[in-house]
């Protein structure tokens, strides 16, 4: 690869030299008339310069042009440079040193002589080493060095040309003659230079080809040597591998032989074991076969004996069958005779009784049916009486147990809330300038503020407990902060609304947690919590619902009913009271619609809508809900009424019952929940007592308004008195 690069570099340099020579020749031929003098050999000798370059300085409008000849390589010791005389440079004649200035140097012969150099000579007369000599490897480097040196000398000559031309012009007296001589010799010299360059290029190319061929031959020899060595090594490795493979094969064969011997011994042992086990199994099988053969023989003996017995039994059965056939014929004959006798007797009875058999059968059925109905009626009456007694007793026990197990605190609430103040001066701040603050508070909250002489207290009055609670929280926040003005009132009112809403949600969640009910719609939970601020006859509705849920759960457990369903229905039965001021209608029906809208079951919805008999109850859950509602709301102290209305209601109840004829005395008992009417037994019989109780109850329902139920009891007592003397 290095040889190829050197060859390519040499070719490039040769092309550059040829181009330089061609440009110089073209410039010389194109200049025309103006040429300036050249330095002669005598001038160079007198100036002391070493003549290694023959330069011709030409000058015209385009500038100077220089023809560069290769420099003369210094001769080695004992070697003469090529030329006509010793010490002559390449392309120079052997003129004497004292030649005149005007005599031009004949150059053509020297170029002709240089056109055919000896095979071993270098360019410019220097000897060239023969191919294969020790200097062969550095020939290309010397060629490049020679070309580079010539180029440098040419450039130096060009740089030195103006000074030499000036000196020549000053010293030369025959410039016109030299100019004409140079003009005549220029074409010949150009052709000589071209031929010399072509010969040199041909020699360099030939030498490069020889070097390439020699290097290629050398590379081929080295490759052959390497191939031979590789084949030897491969053969050696192959032999070694064969030897190792043979050794491994022998070892493997020995190992296989040992393994085969071990396996053979193991197989022999296994075969011996298998043979032993097979012989043992064969003995066992033979013993089993002998046992089976004996069993089969015994079984065949039994079968034969049984077959003989069956044959004997079959013969006996055949005899009995014949006997039965005979008896059957006899019975058929007797049956026919009996039927004839029965027909004769029936005809005689019909004639005597004057009734047919069908009529007698119908009369008998009618008699039996009448007796059965009488007995059934007596039995049903007895069962009903017992059921009423047991049912009433059990219901009383269940209700009593439920009431005893539920002990809930109840505090009545009014429509007025008292807010304590830190001082009486706060009342003036609440009123504000010209009553601005109190008017703003009442218009924003809808709660009336009552300020009287009560020390350190104001009253908040509103029939809506929710609005009253929002107003209380708003006023308490204003009093604690101290800043009371309309804008502040609106801010605190908005904050109080959010707080009350959160309290409602929390109250609903607490109610669910207390009653053990889960998975309820969030809207139902919110509505349930809003009942915390609702009252019914002074009783808190949410507390009433929680108490009703506990009562319904206890009664459902006593009756072995679904406990969660009863609790859920009782907890939601007054849900409509949270919306009664927003939606028209009964709170029972409103609550049922809301529960149905939010995914409650139909049993719960029916219990809600039927707890005040707007819809007839159709399930035990609805009845339990009614009972729990009545127990929670009807117990003494649960609900309150004003004393005046309470007294008037009791008086009117006694008056309604006392105005009836035959009534002796009337007692309103259990805070008006029960009325006992004592009648005169001579004037009012049992039927009239029932009518009196119904009429009194209907008149009370029509004229009075009361919570819960009122029971009317008419007592008719007959006394018989006897005196023993």
UniProtKB/Swiss-Prot annotation:
Q: GO biological process annotations for this chain's record?
A: mRNA catabolic process
What membrane topology is given?
A: Single-pass membrane protein
Q: Segment Disordered: which positions? A: 62-140, 165-195, 300-321
Q: What is its EC number?
A: 3.1.-.-
Keyword Transport tagged: no
Task: Enumerate the InterPro entries for this protein.
Answer: HD/PDEase_dom, HD_domain, HDIG_dom, KH_dom, KH_dom_type_1, KH_dom_type_1_sf, Ribonuclease_Y, RNase_Y_N
Could you tell me which CDD domains the record lists for this protein? HDc, KH-I_RNaseY
Location within or outside the cell = Cell membrane
Q: What UniProt keywords are attached to this protein's entry?
A: Cell membrane, Endonuclease, Hydrolase, Membrane, Nuclease, RNA-binding, Transmembrane, Transmembrane helix
In terms of NCBIfam families, this protein maps to: HDIG (TIGR00277), RNase_Y (TIGR03319)
Name of the molecule in the record: Ribonuclease Y
Organism expressing this protein natively:
Frankia alni (strain DSM 45986 / CECT 9034 / ACN14a)
The gene from which this protein is expressed is rny
């Amino acid at each position: 690869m290095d040889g190829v690069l050197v060859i390519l570099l040499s070719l490039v340099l040769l092309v550059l030299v040829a181009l330089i020579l061609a440009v110089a020749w073209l410039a010389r031929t194109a200049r025309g008339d103006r040429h300036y003098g050249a330095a002669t050999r005598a001038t160079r000798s007198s100036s002391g310069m070493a003549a290694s370059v023959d330069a011709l300085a030409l000058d015209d409008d385009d500038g100077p042009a220089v023809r560069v000849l290769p420099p003369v390589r210094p001769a080695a010791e004992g070697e003469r440079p090529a030329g006509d005389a010793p010490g002559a440079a390449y392309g120079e004649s052997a003129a004497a040193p004292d030649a005149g200035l005007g005599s031009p140097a004949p150059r053509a012969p020297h170029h002709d002589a240089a056109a055919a150099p000896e095979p071993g000579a270098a360019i410019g007369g220097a000897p060239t080493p023969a191919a294969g000599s020790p200097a062969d490897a550095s020939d290309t480097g010397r060629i490049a060095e020679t070309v580079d040196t010539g180029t440098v000398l040419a450039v130096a000559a060009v740089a030195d040309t103006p000074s030499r031309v000036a000196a020549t012009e000053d010293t030369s007296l025959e410039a016109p003659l030299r100019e004409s001589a140079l003009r005549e010799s220029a074409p010949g010299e150009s052709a000589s230079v071209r031929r010399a360059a072509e010969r040199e290029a041909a020699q360099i190319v030939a030498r490069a080809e020889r070097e390439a061929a020699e290097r290629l031959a050398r590379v081929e020899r080295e490759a052959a040597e390497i191939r031979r060595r590789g084949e030897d090594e491969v053969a050696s490795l192959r032999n070694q591998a064969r030897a190792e493979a043979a050794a491994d094969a022998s070892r493997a064969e020995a190992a296989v032989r040992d393994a085969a011997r071990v396996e053979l011994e193991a197989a022999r042992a296994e075969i011996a074991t298998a043979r032993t086990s097979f012989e043992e199994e064969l003995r066992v099988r033979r013993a089993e076969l002998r046992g089976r053969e004996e069993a089969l023989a015994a079984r065949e003996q039994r079968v034969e004996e049984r077959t003989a017995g069956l044959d004997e039994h079959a013969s006996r059965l055949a005899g009995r069958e014949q006997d039965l056939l005979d008896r059957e014929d006899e019975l058929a004959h007797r049956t026919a005779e009996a039927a004839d006798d029965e027909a004769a007797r029936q005809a005689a009875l019909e004639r005597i009784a004057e009734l047919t058999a069908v009529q007698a059968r119908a009369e008998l059925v009618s008699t039996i049916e009448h007796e059965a109905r009488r007995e059934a009626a007596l039995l049903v009456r007895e069962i009903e009486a017992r059921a009423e007694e047991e049912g009433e007793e059990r219901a009383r026990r269940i209700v009593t147990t439920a009431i005893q197990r539920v002990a809930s605190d109840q505090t009545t609430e009014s429509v007025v809330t008292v807010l304590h103040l830190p001082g009486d001066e706060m009342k003036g701040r609440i009123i504000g300038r010209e009553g601005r603050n109190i008017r703003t508070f009442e218009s924003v909250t809808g709660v009336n503020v009552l300020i009287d002489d009560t020390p350190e207290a104001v009253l908040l009055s509103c029939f809506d407990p929710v609005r009253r609670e929002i107003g209380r929280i708003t006023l308490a926040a204003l009093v604690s902060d101290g800043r009371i003005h309309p804008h502040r009132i609106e801010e605190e009112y908005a904050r109080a609304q959010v707080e009350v809403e959160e309290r409602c949600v929390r109250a609903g969640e607490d109610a669910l947690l207390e009653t053990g009910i889960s998975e309820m719609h969030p809207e139902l939970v919110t509505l349930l919590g809003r009942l915390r601020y609702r009252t019914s006859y002074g009783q808190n509705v949410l507390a009433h619902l929680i108490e009703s849920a506990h009562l319904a759960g206890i009664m459902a457990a006593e009756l072995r009913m679904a406990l969660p369903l009863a609790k859920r229905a009782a907890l939601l039965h007054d849900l409509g009271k949270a919306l009664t001021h927003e939606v028209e209608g009964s709170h029972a029906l409103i609550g049922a619609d809301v529960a149905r809208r939010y995914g409650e079951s139909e049993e719960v919805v029916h219990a809600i809508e039927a707890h005040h008999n707007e819809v007839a109850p159709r399930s035990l859950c609805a009845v339990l809900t009614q009972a729990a509602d009545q127990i929670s709301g009807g117990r003494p102290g649960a609900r309150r009424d004003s004393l005046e209305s309470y007294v008037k209601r009791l008086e009117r109840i006694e008056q309604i019952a006392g105005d009836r004829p035959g009534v002796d005395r009337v007692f309103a008992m259990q805070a008006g929940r029960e009325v006992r009417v004592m009648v005169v037994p001579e004037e009012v019989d049992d039927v009239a007592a029932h009518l009196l109780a119904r009429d009194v109850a209907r008149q009370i329902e029509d004229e009075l308004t009361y919570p819960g139920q009122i029971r009317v009891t008419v007592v008719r007592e007959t006394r018989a008195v006897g005196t023993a003397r």
